[in-house]
Each structure stands twice: as structure tokens, then as C-alpha cells.
């Protein structure tokens, strides 16, 4: 089993408006995940310093940051960061720009976990619905261009208030959504802005929003999590011919569009 999580930490500023990175780290330790995607992990101005001191992470958790090295003092890229367990091997990592009116990006890492290779993408999408869809399409296009067809997890704050429309339509064409539940506002959750989406070769065992007393105070978002298992078919069956994979993908996309009533 693999546990993944996503958390918009709001630069370690809680609902009490106090910046307490040690409180944020306590929530991360509560999650007990193998991989965590963070949003708003860096300060907004100046050198974009990490909101979580690297020494604090190293000394008081079992996590290490994926070394994107975007800026010397930053934890991630445009506020997006990935944390993995210290024993997890990071095989590759990559960052990329997203189309937007203000600087936005996404981060990607391939990790060795659970005896398999897992691809993880972290994101924080725009407040504008138009730009959210463009960013979702850019992420999906980037994944198609990458080498390797590994089990994939996409996580982040999508800023999507719709339960079925908007950028969710784009991601639904080839991914399954973990039913994590409402994550915003942390003090009284009314909607699920934070999503975990997985490729069909991953089985979602359990999922939820982590609503411990400290998590309700540490940020304006609750972290979301999912327990996953790589499907048996993925492990046992030979990889299909590329043409067959294309046909299967197109079939999945048509089925997802029909399910969401997206055919025009």
C-alpha cells in the first residue's frame, strides 16, 4: 500500500494568522504519507524562501524534499513542492511552467516506492476557470510527452468549486478521483478544492480529508490523503502495443465524456 497526500499549507500561516512552521510539520507527521504534494510552500516575495525551514524538516520528520533547486532558499517551484519519505529513492524530477497571467508552475517526480515506479505531479491551479482549464490541459499534454507510462498520481489545490465541470472534465478523461471529501475552509469545510487523481492502473483503497484539531488551525485548507495499490493487472500483464494503448486511451476518454455528459 502507498499513501499519498496533498496539502495547501498557506505558507505555514494558520487560521489564527500566526506563522508556525512547526505546527504545519506536526500535521505532515500526522498524515504519515509516503509522498506529499505541498502548495504555497514558499514565501511569495523576495528570494521565495521556504515556509518550512529545511533544518526543521530534516530534524523533526521522516521526510525529505524532492530537490527541484528552483531557487537556493526555496522548497519548490512557484510554491509547489514534493516531500517523500527519507528512504524513498527519487529517480527523476522535473518542473514546468503553466500558462497563466501570473507565474504558475507544476512539479513532477518519479519515485521508487512499494517495489514499483510511481509518477507524482503536484499543482496549484488558477483562480480563473478559463486559465484552470488551460493549465489542466497543459499538464496532461506534458504527461503525454514524458518518457515512460508509469502509474501516475496528480495532486493539488485545483481551486475548482464545481463538482463535475471546469478543469475536472479535463482530468476525468483519463484519471480516477479519490473521494476525499470537503477540504476548504479548514474551520468549516464546505467544498473540495483539493484533489487526488490517479491513473486507472492504481486502485484507491481509502481516502479522506484529515481534520484533526491541529489541522483545522494550521492552514485554511485541510490536507487530503489516499491509500493506493498498484493494480494486479498492471503487474502481471505484458505492456500492450503502443497502438493498442492509444485505442484504450481513446476508449477511456469517450467513456469518461459520456459519464460526465460532455459530448457536444
Where are these regions (language model features)?
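Active-site regions of metal-assisted phosphoester/phosphodiester hydrolases
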Residues: 1-35, 59-60, 64-264
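Active-site neighborhood of divalent metal-dependent phosphoester/pyrophosphate hydrolases
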Residues: 12, 39-46
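Short active-site-adjacent helix-start/loop capping segments
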Residues: 44-47, 74-76
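Glycine-rich loop at the start of a catalytic domain that most often binds anionic cofactors/ligands
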Residues: 50-51, 82
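Phosphate-coordination/substrate-recognition cap region in phosphate-metabolizing enzymes
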Residues: 53, 57
Amino acid at each position: 500500500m502507498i499513501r499519498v497526500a496533498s496539502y495547501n499549507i498557506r505558507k505555514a500561516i494558520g487560521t489564527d494568522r500566526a506563522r508556525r512552521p512547526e505546527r504545519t510539520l506536526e500535521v505532515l507527521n500526522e498524515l504519515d504519507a509516503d509522498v506529499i504534494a505541498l502548495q504555497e510552500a514558499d514565501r511569495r516575495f523576495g528570494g521565495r524562501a521556504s515556509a518550512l525551514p529545511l533544518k526543521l524538516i530534516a530534524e523533526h520528520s521522516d521526510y525529505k524534499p524532492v530537490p527541484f533547486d528552483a531557487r537556493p532558499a526555496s522548497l519548490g517551484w512557484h510554491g509547489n513542492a514534493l516531500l517523500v519519505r527519507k528512504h524513498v529513492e527519487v529517480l527523476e524530477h522535473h518542473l514546468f511552467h503553466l500558462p497563466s497571467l501570473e507565474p504558475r508552475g507544476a512539479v513532477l517526480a518519479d519515485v521508487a516506492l512499494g517495489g514499483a515506479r510511481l509518477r507524482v505531479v503536484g499543482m496549484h491551479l488558477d483562480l480563473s476557470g478559463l486559465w484552470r482549464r488551460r493549465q489542466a490541459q497543459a499538464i496532461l499534454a506534458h504527461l503525454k510527452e514524458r518518457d515512460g507510462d508509469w502509474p501516475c498520481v496528480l495532486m493539488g489545490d485545483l481551486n475548482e468549486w464545481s463538482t463535475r465541470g471546469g478543469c475536472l472534465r479535463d482530468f476525468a478523461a483519463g484519471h480516477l478521483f479519490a473521494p476525499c471529501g470537503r477540504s476548504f475552509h479548514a474551520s468549516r469545510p464546505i467544498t473540495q478544492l483539493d484533489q487526488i487523481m490517479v491513473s486507472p492502473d492504481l486502485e484507491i483503497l481509502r481516502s479522506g480529508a484529515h481534520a484533526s484539531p491541529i489541522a483545522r488551525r494550521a492552514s485554511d485548507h485541510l490536507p487530503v490523503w489516499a491509500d493506493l495499490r498498484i493494480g494486479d493487472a498492471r503487474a502481471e500483464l505484458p505492456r500492450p502495443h503502443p497502438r493498442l494503448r492509444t485505442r484504450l486511451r481513446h476508449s477511456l476518454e469517450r467513456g469518461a465524456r459520456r459519464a460526465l455528459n460532455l459530448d457536444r
